Amino acid sequence: MAEVATEIALCGVAAVCDLTGALYLPDLDTLVVSDLHLEKGAAFARRGQLLPPYDTQATLQLLDAVVTRYQPKTVISLGDNFHDRVGSVLMPSLYREMIQSIARGRDLVWINGNHDPDGTSDLPGISVDEIALAGLTFRHEPSLAHGKGEVAGHLHPSATVRRREKSVRRPCFATDGNRLVMPSFGVTTGGLDLRHKAFTGLFTRTDLIAHLLGRDRIYSVRFGNLLG
């Protein structure tokens, strides 16, 4: 049977890394996603660069599916929820209604990101810079100074492995057991290799594991076994 989720522990808190890129915390009944970058296509169109305009719908459909599966009490979105400051203001009513449906009966927490520092407009839930739960701190950008128990996004980690004589690069959860950096959840977002200098100092590399999101399962690979 395909391993569509992997159980880990973060500072003693049980967590489930889901193949969609979502993180579920069963003891907190909380689902975490990061870097949705909703309305990215619309943001590019406003600058004269045309992308297919279906990214928001596809991302929200994926989010709805994983929320339906886990039925969490709380959903936390770790920043860069929208691709620019006006995304939530100009978003079509169809997508606004999809978010309202996802939020129905649960708490929705929007963490402010660098793309959307002003928070969200006329959407259910609260907008905050960070939130702490059960010894874990949820914020958008990883902090070198305050790493223990941190769950962050921003960097869109990916990793490269060799499989069947080919190099394969996939988004990943990155964790050493003390800190976790989430993969981006948005369907049109890129990734930054875990060996990039932006990750320097964030993890104890001897304990660092990349949980790669494959096509139909998760692959857990120690940092030393990744391709550079």
State what each model feature region is.
Residues 1-228:
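Extended recognition/assembly regions associated with phosphoester-bond processing machinery
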